[in-house]
A protein has these predicted regions:
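A short helix->loop->beta-strand "cap" motif at the edges of active sites that frequently abuts
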Residues: 67, 88, 146-150, 177-178
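Active-site phosphate-binding strand-loop segment of PLP-dependent enzymes
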Residues: 97-168
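N-terminal small-domain helix-loop-helix segment of the aminotransferase-like
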Residues: 1-50, 57, 237-240, 303, ...
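Helix C-cap/helix->beta junction micro-motif
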Residues: 86, 146-147, 266, 300, ...
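Conserved glycine-rich beta-strand-loop-beta hairpin in the small C-terminal domain of fold type I
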Residues: 235, 251-260, 270-283, 314
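PLP-dependent aminotransferase-like
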Residues: 60-121, 142
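Conserved core segment of the aminotransferase class I/II
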Residues: 179-253, 340
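PLP-dependent enzyme catalytic core of the Aspartate aminotransferase-like
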Residues: 109-110, 286, 295-304, 310-344
Length: 344
């Protein structure tokens, strides 16, 4: 597919700003949601320049300075920065691992306070690769509604499952008892971070949803940050999303299998992952995570992230990108495992 051709639409030379985004772009996103089983009307969608901006808009909508949001642990470290820029505090709820990952709903309930304005879920989570299950989604909606908190559902990696699972919630978009904002974007869904287009879809009780949309429209109108060319290109790009996703999905799955095969029978354990672009390797705590990262970089020529970047509760975990070219990933994985064997 020629992405540049889609960006060359002459209509992009006309500037006709719409705070929520051009209707054809929003209609293309509704079709993308429909593929995941959700019927989302175009007037439920608001475009942003990135999912980070979508978070920023949501925090402006939901929070006053000093309010709190709940985020998963372990997860992506950007939440602290996004919240801090809005003078919002971050508390965490744990994801537990017992062979598979799951939300500790009881601890989430304990973490909710009168100043909690939103609960963030990432499905699949980065870096654990765990999807929110339908049973967890129902519990989350009930808890959020009881505490008058919104749900921010980050679904940027939803198109990259590693296996099928009928218990999985394909999206948290549903008009349940809690205001819900579902986030996505071209950066992950089409592997095009340079195009800077993301979105949020609003669900929940009608009154709360309509008030949220009106207020978000004011926020978006204040910035008008989404470029016209990418909005014109979005329908053509999203129509070919499956073609863009397929090679990424194949590479990620293949690299994960290579890593599992390399680690088999060694002191290194590959944790279960259901989706996303990362793998987690549990290694012996004979070194600190920083020491593991440095020795692998300096002596083996392999780059990995330490688990504490993602707020793992204990050592020693290493996070690997599964996006590396296979001819680079396979020897890199072998060098990691060999280093672990020599250090155990």
């Amino acid at each position: 597919m020629n992405v540049l051709a889609a960006l060359a639409d002459p209509g992009a030379l006309a500037y006709e700003p719409d705070p929520v985004g051009r209707l054809p772009a929003r209609e293309a996103i509704t079709a993308d949601f429909r593929r995941r089983g959700a019927d989302v009307a175009p007037d439920r969608i608001l475009l942003t320049a990135s999912t980070s901006e979508a978070y920023a808009f949501a925090l402006k909508l939901l929070c006053d300075p000093g309010d709190t949001i709940l985020v998963p642990r372990p997860s992506y470290p950007l939440f602290e920065y996004l919240a801090g820029l809005e003078s919002v505090s971050v508390q965490s709820y744990p994801l537990r691992y017992d062979g598979t990952w799951h939300i500790d709903v009881a601890e989430m309930a304990e973490a909710l306070t009168e100043r909690t304005r939103a609960v963030v879920v990432v499905s699949p989570n980065n870096p654990t690769g765990s999807f929110v299950k339908m049973e967890e989604a129902e519990a989350l909606r009930s808890l959020a509604a009881r505490h008058e908190a919104a749900i921010l559902s980050d679904e940027v990696f939803a198109d990259f499952p590693l296996r099928d699972d009928p218990a999985r919630a394909p999206t948290l978009f549903a008009d349940g008892p809690a205001l819900t904002l579902c986030l996505g974007g071209l950066s992950k869904s089409c592997g095009l971070p340079q195009l800077k287009l993301a979105w949020m879809a609003l669900a929940g009780p009608a009154a709360a949803r309509e008030e949220a949309r009106a207020r978000l429209e004011v926020v978006a109108d204040t910035y008008l940050s989404v470029s016209t060319p990418v909005q014109h290109a979005a329908p053509a790009i999203l129509a070919r999303a499956a073609e863009l996703q397929a090679p990424i999905r194949e590479r990620v799955r293949s690299n994960l299998e290579v890593l599992r095969a390399a680690a088999a029978g060694s002191p290194a354990t590959v944790l279960d992952a259901e989706g996303g672009w990362s793998a987690i390797l549990h290694v012996p705590a004979t070194r600190s995570e920083d020491e593991w990262v440095l020795v692998l970089a300096e002596q083996d020529g392999v780059l990995v992230h330490p688990g504490y970047f993602f707020d793992f509760p204990r050592e020693a975990y290493l996070v690997l990108s599964l996006l590396s070219p296979p001819d680079e990933f396979a020897p890199g994985a072998a060098r990691i495992v060999e280093r672990v064997k020599r250090s155990a």
